[in-house]
Amino acid sequence: MNNLSLANEKTKIQVRGLEFFYNNQKSLKSIDMTIPEKRITAIIGPSGCGKSTLLRVFNRIYAMYPKQEARGEVLLNGENILAPGYSMNRLRSHVGMVFQKPVPFPMSIYDNISYAIKHHEKLSRREMEDRVEQALRGAALWDEVKDKLKQSATGLSGGQQQRLCIARTIALRPQVLLLDEPTSALDPISTGRIEQLITELKEQFTVIIVTHNMQQAARCSDYTAFMFMGELIEHGDTDTIFTKPSKTQTEDYITGRFG
């Protein structure tokens, strides 16, 4: 058992009274939660419970689509990212996201990393080479691709492609890393590599992962939040959530009685 407690952690994200609407239908209901800095927080729950919606609020990706609205407060470093004046470019530089299916750009491995950086910073050639290497090392991919950086990224295996997407995201040096079912399309060996990588990434980043795989949440995360029908039912350290949950709904889900 660990001795983790949200009360003793430094807060990275504070969620207050968050509600979310699709076409005027409420899908998140008065969410209050704290995301601690440089820890891994897993969000679990049955399909349609709102966990991916919550994740997408953290970088406001929903703003790309019509008739979607978030209300309440999401404080990143004490600033409300939902405020009208909060810059989207600033938010995207602070909060990176990796999706369920790896989507490498149809270009070289090197350009997959440098392309994203060029849109945010002006670096010399040497600085860019160093940044690309750092990102690939950070995603545990460098040793596998260092001799074929000019080859197409689409030729990588599924697991390598997902690590490339992680490298592309961390190359921008965000503060928060969002992972939406990052291993659901991968084989067990690739999944194991990604899980090991996730545990290493928390040394530099605050990590939030949405997963249907409860074993993955138990293995990787420091804290776990259980959601059901748009509500946050329980949130605490992972050991407690999985062994001594305080809510019956949480216990029923974890023990397989529904979901």
Swiss-Prot record:
It catalyses: phosphate(out) + ATP + H2O = ADP + 2 phosphate(in) + H(+). InterPro entries: AAA+_ATPase (IPR003593), ABC_transporter-like_ATP-bd (IPR003439), ABC_transporter-like_CS (IPR017871), P-loop_NTPase (IPR027417), PstB-like (IPR005670). It holds the Pfam family ABC_tran. It is an enzyme of class 7 (translocase). PROSITE patterns: ABC_TRANSPORTER_1, ABC_TRANSPORTER_2, PSTB. Residues 13-254 form the ABC transporter domain. GO terms for cellular component: plasma membrane. Its EC number is 7.3.2.1. SUPFAM superfamilies: P-loop containing nucleoside triphosphate hydrolases. The keyword Cell inner membrane applies. ATP binds at G45, P46, S47, G48, C49, G50, K51, S52. GO terms for molecular function: ATP binding; ATP hydrolysis activity; ATPase-coupled phosphate ion transmembrane transporter activity. Transmembrane segments: none annotated. Keywords: ATP-binding, Cell inner membrane, Cell membrane, Membrane, Nucleotide-binding, Phosphate transport, Translocase, Transport. GO terms for biological process: phosphate ion transmembrane transport. It is a peripheral membrane protein. Part of the ABC transporter complex PstSACB involved in phosphate import. Responsible for energy coupling to the transport system. Belongs to the ABC transporter superfamily. Phosphate importer (TC 3.A.1.7) family. The complex is composed of two ATP-binding proteins (PstB), two transmembrane proteins (PstC and PstA) and a solute-binding protein (PstS). This is Phosphate import ATP-binding protein PstB 1. It comes from Pseudomonas syringae pv. tomato (strain ATCC BAA-871 / DC3000). The lineage of its organism: Bacteria, Pseudomonadati, Pseudomonadota, Gammaproteobacteria, Pseudomonadales. The gene is pstB1.
